[in-house]
């Protein structure tokens, strides 16, 4: 669909309908309902959908149809403007005061709009509709509410702009247009801001469309109206007011009563079957209403919207724009005092702004520390510089605070071979001197820590310089429940000693996997596969 500005049409500009080779009925053609004063819309038609109406061609041939001057700048090449067929008013889409069609094959490929032509299209060019929108004059209330609203603004800014624009109505300015109807008044739906829902793991899920029943929860909805009648109608949005199954169960159940009333036959048609109005329980209705019902999407015809509120109703986002939007019809409660909704919205915005301005900074309740170390190593006093890839610490407490769980120290070798003598030496000599030598030994040793992601080659080389190293877990068994400390140390020693064999074995496994994938792919394509090792060819 293309749009263009600066097109003017006189009200009495008409033409005699002579050529009726292709005259489609485009009342059901859906084009987004937006306020486009004096703008042209160009839309592609489909022959199998927008078929030629023979009866309309016979009836309207020779009659006057509204027309306008189609600007040549719409097309990239010369176009036979005399071959456009202007449609009667009753055959135009809703919201257009004039429009015509170029039949199939009338426009050349060079003159047909590129954006509307399908890629790789063959055959004659499809028909094209060129229409002029009505010069829509919205009510003063709608203009004042929508004056400063922009799509790019966040929801909070839109809310404030609506209230700021509505202050003129509070000061006594009333709309000068005549009432649309005496049976009901037209309202604008305003949804109060709700707390954001947690993000869904499936953000692009398919949105279910409800065609059989539509029961939204309108308890958090305000209806703004310029004048008050016993009944009011408002266009709902399937996006902002989605179908709620719990409301449907409550409306069709026997647990609570749904207040009902009769819709005036002078304003509404007779509803039957699935199109009948669904009356809501009072707890799901907006404030200030004693009864209310909802008409599902598609229950009312386009003609009804056109004759009643179609061109004056505020636009609402819909999941399906090819059918008419849902409608709320409510009966105002006269017994309750009148609620100044605009004032309530202003107070809510001021309260929200004051809360945001005085909101203190939230500090984390738990200090989540990031593990820095993995292994603490004692190095000799002769080499105070930490090994490659490690950093120095002052004490074991500092190393354990950094997250070290493995302790490596140089193992002192003894010449005694008798186990009993070794035990006697350990029990008789080592234990009494442990406390005395502890402080002196700590002064002679330097502590270094390795990160969890340190290079394993650097760790192994540092341990190799120590000679015979003793690996231990300083943490007790209660501090590591469910962990076999001895087995973990054996596995760590195996990884440090046989790291090259582990790497070569892993590399061989990857090469074997690549070989099998290539072999299976070639055999699946029925191509001979040559084995690299033996040189033989395999055929499937």
From Swiss-Prot:
Region entry Disordered, spans: 416-443
Record's keyword annotation contains Chaperone: no
Basic and acidic residues composition bias: residue spans: 417-443
InterPro entries: DM7 (IPR006610)
Keyword Repeat: yes
Family stated for the protein in its record: Belongs to the DM7 family.
Sorted UniProt keywords: Repeat
Name by which UniProt lists this protein: DM7 family protein GM11956
